[in-house]
């Protein structure tokens, strides 16, 4: 299951992600963050961390450097 989600993230990055202008306010980008979180923490915690990050990525958040804990 974890590998399926990682593959979907890669599919997003190399297809849809190339069609829309970059707008992530953080470094690493939200898709990279989700990938790193899944690899480092596993499926449940990785998804939780990634979703929290995506919800913080909006115009009213300053963004900046935000590594995977």
Curated annotation (Swiss-Prot):
Keywords assigned by UniProt, alphabetized: Cell inner membrane, Cell membrane, Membrane
Keyword Cell inner membrane listed: yes
Locations listed in the record: Cell inner membrane
Entry GO CC: plasma membrane
Keyword DNA repair: no
Domain of life: Bacteria
Membrane topology recorded in Swiss-Prot or TrEMBL: Peripheral membrane protein
Major subcellular site: membrane
Function description: Could be involved in insertion of integral membrane proteins into the membrane.
PANTHER family xrefs: MEMBRANE PROTEIN INSERTION EFFICIENCY FACTOR-RELATED
Similarity remark: Belongs to the UPF0161 family.
Stated name of the protein: Putative membrane protein insertion efficiency factor
Annotated organism of origin: Nitrosomonas europaea (strain ATCC 19718 / CIP 103999 / KCTC 2705 / NBRC 14298)
Lineage, broadest ranks: Bacteria, Pseudomonadati, Pseudomonadota, Betaproteobacteria, Nitrosomonadales
């Amino acid at each position: 299951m974890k590998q399926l989600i990682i593959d979907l993230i890669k599919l997003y990055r190399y297809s849809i992600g190339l069609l829309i202008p970059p707008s992530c306010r953080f470094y690493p980008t939200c898709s990279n963050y989700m990938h790193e979180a899944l690899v480092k923490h596993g499926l449940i915690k990785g998804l939780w961390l990634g979703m929290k990050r995506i919800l913080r990525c909006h115009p009213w958040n300053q963004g900046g450097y935000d590594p995977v804990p």
